[in-house]
Amino acid sequence: MERSNRIIGGATAPAEKWPFMAAVVSKGYNGGKGQFCGASFIGSRYVLTAAHCLDATLGEDIEVIIGQQNLSAATSEQRLSVRKVYIHEEYADAALGNDIAILELSEEFEGAPVALVEASVRNSLAAGTNLTVMGWGDQDPTDNFRGATQLQQVDVNLIAQQTCRNVGGDYAKISDTAFCAGLVQGGKDSCQGDSGGPIVVSDNGQYKQLGIVSWGDGCAEKGKYGVYANVSYYADWIANKTKGLSYDQHVYEGIVSPGIQSATLTYRNDSESELLLSNFSTTSSAQIVHNTCEQPLAIGTECQVTTSYSLLGYGDFSYDVTMDSNQGIGQVKSTVHYQSYPLADPFISDWIMGQIPNQQLSVFSQGIEWDFSAIGIMSGNLEKDQHSGIAISGIEKGQLALDMSVSSEEKFDELKIFVNGRLELSVSGEQKGTVSFVLPREKNVIELVYVKDELGSEGADRGFLNAIRYSSSLILPSAESSSSGSSSGGSLGWLSLFALLGFLRRKY
């Protein structure tokens, strides 16, 4: 099933009609180019969105624009920084429910929040009730992406739960955690890029948020519907996450060598009363070596917990740090994640460090070692079901341009590029060109992994990296013209990469 995070068949929203509407924007891109998901401001310093928008995302990777109808007109002062990201603890896949997340802004926002629908109102709504959904996403129901810089809105109908389940496939799994909306005949829907945005209903003349754009089979297709996370079902979860305890839910420590590793978690009290944090514990043999959270945490103050972990061997490693809090917050869990690989061949490392001079870098190898090509480096010579990866850790904040090419069996043998643990691009077939990435964190990790399947080979069956260019600037140049965004043929420019990064990467 082809799922889309998906406004089709609508119209431009009147200015200032939806002051709570928010855009989630990749840091380093302008509002029009960088928006990849919608969201809604729910008060104080909190923004509601979809969990699937935030795969491997930390607050420092993104910004939020609230109440701006035209994203291209948003100024830097209107871009709000994000301190923390909270994803529903039971989220695994949008089709399985729990597709909900909260962004905690670095500062309180003074704008008008959206009211959330109560369970009693949700349960009283009849099938056919008119709903309004909005976003800056795809306006073309075909495979050709056509986004919008001005906010769009469209009216759709609430669909009965059983009617939606009868569509079959993943629709059959829909429970009380979600609901469907659309038209039986199709033609109106949310679409790719609208994910995380609100769908609202008029309740005695006041618009309230009923759901969050989650997924759907295509966009605006006959007999198919958009699926939305049911906000009222998550009322307690939302209330808990907005009580004012700020903490690190997920910590990515990057790629490291085996040995003793430490991580520090920060807890901040942004509530209206003193917080008591207690019963700290860890899993997977990690130990707490320093804890400044043993005393009551006063309003507006922080405390820290430092852990030590003996990392043995290579692979992916994680452990949890849990603690209890008062004020009805209950148990809080943070997960610390490491990746460990052997160091790369020193000659390969020297070549990379020569491309990115004057930085403290570590270069690691994954699977089969990379080798030198005529003008740069290339993935190793692979047999079936093997992979060859290179990882560069410690790159400073800025942007990185890669002159690269791929020669492979289209759609089967791929070069995958990860930034800070998040898949940003998969390229196959015959491709060459330059791709650029924003590196938003103080220290960043980029990985290039060529993956070969169990079947045949075509072309050189390798990925090639010919040159690397680093800039401390965090803003990628805007582009007036769009390329196709294809990842399987022809030249590969940074703009086509962005189309993949912001949209095609998100399959819902």
Named regions from a protein language model:
Residues 491-508:
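A cross-kingdom C-terminal cell-surface attachment/processing module
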Residues 35-55, 62-63, 68, 147-162, ...:
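C-terminal subregion of chymotrypsin/trypsin-like serine protease catalytic domains
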Residues 24-27, 47-50, 55-90, 161-167, ...:
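Conserved H-D interstitial segment of serine endopeptidase catalytic domains
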Residues 212, 221, 243-342, 476-486:
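Feature for long, exposed domains in two main contexts
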Residues 1-47, 57, 63-68, 184, ...:
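Protease-domain processing segments flanking chymotrypsin-fold serine proteases, especially trypsin-like
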Residues 70, 74, 78-81, 97-186, ...:
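Chymotrypsin/trypsin-fold serine protease catalytic domain
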Residues 372-395, 412, 431-436, 465:
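Short beta-strands within extracellular/lumenal beta-sheet-rich domains
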Residues 448-459:
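Short beta-strand-plus-loop segments that form exposed binding edges in beta-rich domains
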